[in-house]
């Protein structure tokens, strides 16, 4: 019974996270330090960096 309750809570949490994923992402990335870290991390990946440079220029 306890295991079923844990699975149900996990499923509800996953659905809530999925429904609010963009709101959560905007909240997290509104912090300048975190946003800078994410940009730095993604620009270190060659495929993403090349795509970004092609679109920018």
UniProtKB/Swiss-Prot annotation:
Q: What is this protein called?
A: Uncharacterized protein YqgO
Annotated organism of origin:
Bacillus subtilis (strain 168)
């Amino acid at each position: 019974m306890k295991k079923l309750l844990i699975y149900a809570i996990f499923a509800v949490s996953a659905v809530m996270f999925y429904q609010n994923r963009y709101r959560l992402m905007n909240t997290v990335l509104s912090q300048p330090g975190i946003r800078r870290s994410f940009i730095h991390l993604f620009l270190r990946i060659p495929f993403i960096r090349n795509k970004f440079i092609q679109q920018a220029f």
